[in-house]
Each structure stands twice: as structure tokens, then as C-alpha cells.
Design a protein with these regions (language model features):
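Bacterial Sec-dependent N-terminal signal peptides
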Residues: 1-30
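Intrinsically disordered, low-complexity linker/terminal regions across diverse proteins
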Residues: 27-147
């Protein structure tokens, strides 16, 4: 194998590694916006327990501020050994779930804004339909906002 072939393979490997690394960290951000969702009317999958999950690859503790747009701002600390799980609520009228009868209204008191001093991962999970179904919303952070 020629040196020039090895050089080209090295450059391609390096480019692929950078490309993959960029996408793997796309969910890692210092700011996350979690919008509310709604349920189907007359559904057998009524939302039940809902949890906000926050984690980080950081070994050192990271301060996190969770702004529940309907209530208060709460401060927490997370690390890679101590992720955070916050109980959001139960049913179809919580900070995360909007009743289907309200979807045509302007809603300004639902959803979350999560801010941290170092990058964190954020997801919101719920169980529905007598514990038989589950769903998850994973925040892409600021990279999810586009250009």
C-alpha cells in the first residue's frame, strides 16, 4: 500500500470521526426547551406518570435550573454518577401535557426551559394507558433550533 493511500484513508477516517462525534453530542446542550404535548380525545392512552430526566457526562457536579413555565424555577445539581429524575405530574393537564380541548388556545404556562452551566442531556418520559404504553421526548438543545 502506498503512503498516499494511507494518507487518504487517514484523512477520511478523521473526517468521519469528526462528523460522527458532532452528531453524537447534538443532544448535549446548556439550554433546552421542552414544549408541551397534547393527547388524543377519547383515547385509551391517557397520560399518567411523567418524569423529566437530566444527565451529564461531566464527572464534576453541574448546576441546573429548571424553569417550569406554569410554576416555579428550581435549582438542582447533576453529575454523570448522579442523574436527576423530576416527577412532573399525572394526567392530561400538567406542565408537559395539555388537554386536547385546549390545543386551539394560546398556551404560555406549559413546558420547560432547562439551563445549566455545563452541557446536559434532557428527556421527558411518560407512561400512559394503564401502564401499557410509554413515550419519550428527547431535547436536542440549542442545536434543535436550527440556524
Amino acid at each position: 500500500m502506498k503512503v498516499s493511500d494511507l494518507h487518504i484513508k487517514f484523512k477520511l477516517s478523521l473526517a468521519l470521526t469528526i462528523f460522527v462525534t458532532t452528531f453524537l453530542s447534538a443532544q448535549l446542550s446548556r439550554t433546552h426547551y421542552i414544549p408541551p404535548i397534547t393527547t388524543a380525545a377519547n383515547s385509551n392512552a391517557t397520560p399518567q406518570n411523567q418524569y423529566l430526566h437530566i444527565s451529564t457526562p461531566s464527572i464534576t457536579p453541574v448546576n441546573v435550573e429548571v424553569n417550569d413555565l406554569g410554576n416555579v424555577i428550581s435549582n438542582y445539581t447533576v453529575s454523570n454518577a448522579n442523574p436527576l429524575e423530576i416527577y412532573v405530574g399525572f394526567g392530561d393537564n400538567t406542565s408537559f401535557v395539555v388537554p386536547s380541548s385546549n390545543i386551539e388556545s394560546e398556551i404560555s404556562n406549559k413546558g420547560f426551559i432547562i439551563q445549566s452551566e455545563k452541557p446536559v442531556y434532557v428527556s421527558l418520559r411518560l407512561v400512559a394507558g394503564n401502564q401499557n404504553q410509554a413515550g419519550s421526548l428527547v431535547s436536542k438543545g440549542l442545536s434543535g433550533l436550527g440556524n
